Structure formats: C-alpha cells, structure tokens
Amino acid sequence: MNAVEIYTDGACKGNPGPGGWGAFLKSADSQKELFGGELGTTNNRMEMTAVIEALAALKRPCQVTLHVDSQYVLKGMTEWLAGWKARGWKTAAKQPVKNVDLWQRLDELVSTSGHRIDWRWVRGHNGDPGNEHADMLANRGVELALRQR
C-alpha cells in the first residue's frame, strides 16, 4: 500500500463569501497540487472540499497521513461522525448537522476507498511547509473563484 502525505486547507474572503480550497499530496515518487474555488461558500465547506478532492484524487487504496488545520474537519471525522449518523444526521442538541452534504460525501469516500487514514492536526499559519503550501493553493482557489464572477 503506497504511503501518501496530504496537506489540506480552505480559505474564504468573508464567511460566507468567495472561497478556495487547496491540497498538496506527496508520496515517495511524486507530488500533486489541487485547488479550486466557489463564490458563495464558507471556510468550513472549503476545508471539507479540500479533503474530499484530495482523497478522491488517489487512484488506489493508500496509507494516508492527512494533515488538516481545521478542528472542525478533524473532530468531525474522528469524534462526531458516528454520533451524527446514529442520530440520523442530527447533532447532540438534535439540530441538523451543518454541511451534511459534504459530511456524507466524505464519509462515503473514507468508508469505500480502502484508504487507511491517520488524521493529524497541524496549527495553521505556523510555518509548517506542507500547511503553508496548502494555504497558498487555497488562496489560489479564492482568486479563481473571484475571476469567475
């Protein structure tokens, strides 16, 4: 099983507002940059989209070390998801889960891809080269969204 390190980030100018996502993937023999943007979106949606697009770009099951600077994504996947599903996509306060469309896509992708994922939190804007690279790509995605107006 190939080992892949992934760094993801989301950015938003206004929340909601134009946003972008970026992902930097690296393995022993290759690197890949992914980015995109949307107009009326939120930072959390862009953080999630970055993870979805990065995992979807992998063509076969991999051992993934996934670095995110979003506690929302990290805790959603490692702490909250099972409870949300058990409650029919409701929070502990019985409210609908926000961004349920993306949570369901991410859950489906993780559970059917065959990837083994080690979720890791990295402090954003703190000099981590992989995170800084993903941040640059996310900002490129914002620029792309703004050009599409």
From Swiss-Prot:
Protein name (record): Ribonuclease H
Family: Belongs to the RNase H family.
Keyword Metal-binding: yes
Gene: rnhA
Known role: Endonuclease that specifically degrades the RNA of RNA-DNA hybrids.
Organism: Albidiferax ferrireducens (strain ATCC BAA-621 / DSM 15236 / T118)
InterPro entries named in the record: RNase_H, RNaseH-like_sf, RNaseH_domain, RNaseH_sf, RNaseHI
GO cellular component, one term: cytoplasm
Stored NCBIfam families: PRK00203.1
Domain RNase H type-1: residue ranges: 1-143
